[in-house]
Amino acid sequence: MADEYLVPLDQYLAAGVHIGTQQKTKDMKKFIYRVRQDGLYVLDVRKTDERLKVAGKFLAKFEPQSILAVSVRLYGQKPVKKFGEVTGARAIPGRFLPGTMTNPAVKNFFEPDVLIVTDPRADHQAMREAVEIGIPIVALVDTENLLSYVDLAIPTNNKGRKALALIYWILAREILYNRGEIQSREDFKIPVEEFEMKIVRR
């Protein structure tokens, strides 16, 4: 059915995909479902799901190695790295070196055809360079983000460990499915836990 979720609604909720922040921007108003009594804005998971479907189809059109996914945020680093391994995309977890996309003298210089950012605010350097070279930007966006220069927004909790793992897992699966590399979504056998940043307890 066309209105079915990519994963059960309970799985989205358990991962906290819908949990926003206590700030909202005008840009994000259309993605907000409600505000809780404690002032926390809650995202509309249906819209998250819809955007993941669109993003999967869009990204599947690119050569795998021409996709760049980045995450300065700690909890996005393992998901981005695993996403790269699974889809063939280039991944930069951690610090994004200025000039990576714009300065051929930089050691790991790379000109992608599309950029995926985990958080427009944290990944602002990568976004700035993507705008400079004129490539589309797919962004995971929370309630306090702005959509300036974002071509395709995926509304989600972009700070939570489990939320980021689930979003990148779904996105990887959707890309493989839309490329025809798997015949059905059930053929994607990699557990979501492999996308999840582990907490090191001292």
From Swiss-Prot:
Subunit (UniProt): Part of the 30S ribosomal subunit.
Pfam families (UniProt xref): Ribosomal_S2
UniProt signal peptide: none
Protein name as catalogued: Small ribosomal subunit protein uS2
Taxon lineage: Archaea, Methanobacteriati, Methanobacteriota, Thermococci, Thermococcales
Molecular function GO labels: structural constituent of ribosome
Organism of provenance: Pyrococcus furiosus (strain ATCC 43587 / DSM 3638 / JCM 8422 / Vc1)
Keyword Repeat: no
The keyword Ribonucleoprotein is annotated on this UniProt entry: yes
Keywords, ordered alphabetically: Ribonucleoprotein, Ribosomal protein
Family stated for the protein in its record: Belongs to the universal ribosomal protein uS2 family.
PANTHER family cross-referenced by the UniProt entry: 40S RIBOSOMAL PROTEIN SA
One cellular-component annotation, GO: small ribosomal subunit
A biological-process GO annotation: translation
InterPro entries reported in the protein's UniProt record: Ribosomal_uS2 (IPR001865), Ribosomal_uS2_arc (IPR023454), Ribosomal_uS2_CS (IPR018130), Ribosomal_uS2_euk/arc (IPR005707), Ribosomal_uS2_flav_dom_sf (IPR023591)
